[in-house]
């Protein structure tokens, strides 16, 4: 939200929890997730789903993966044909094994779905630390339109038509990251983590290719970059 506000866009932040909306609007700081980062006064907060969706040209969907479908269902009645929905969550839906973008497209077929992913910790983006990401859409012109909205001097955005590969890389890297954390906890060293990373990205790429993704996606920001 801060990034888009700094780029000159009017931003409405939505939450399903009215108490959270009221607290953020009053304190102008997310003390739980982004302590010390001031939220500009011109960013609005609302729990009114219809108002926020209908007022927006681009919706950035930033919810935990188990709630992607329920949130998409909540938005669906108000989304206009062709309206952009950019998913930034990472995961696979447990019951269906669908990517989060596939879930969005299933629940909101009238939207233009996109995914923004890469090595991008929210707290670093909020503090304007240089970051690079990839935006994926089915059509090149949509990717370039969204690229111009998000990109600035400290947030570099590349484009890709491989939405499937971007989603797979972002979701499956979590498994390898957990393994690397376990290796740390067991007192293992760099040798072990190097093996986990290199063999892990190989497994991710094999699965992605089998599902129809572009092999090159997994050597880039949303593959090895996100994993590191």
What is the meaning of each model-derived region?
Residues 1-37, 43-47:
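NAD(P)+-binding Rossmann beta1-loop-alpha1 motif at the extreme N-terminus of oxidoreductases
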Residues 19-23, 94-95, 143:
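Short, charged/polar "capping" segments at the starts of alpha-helices
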Residues 67, 78, 103-111, 130-216:
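Internal alpha-helical scaffold of NAD(P)-dependent oxidoreductase catalytic cores
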Residues 212-228:
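C-terminal substrate-binding/catalytic lobe of Rossmann-fold NAD(P)-dependent oxidoreductases
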Residues 39, 45, 49-54, 58-130, ...:
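Rossmann-like NAD(P)(H) cofactor-binding subdomain of soluble oxidoreductases
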Residues 16, 90, 138:
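Cofactor-binding loop segments of dinucleotide-utilizing enzymes, especially the Rossmann-like FAD-
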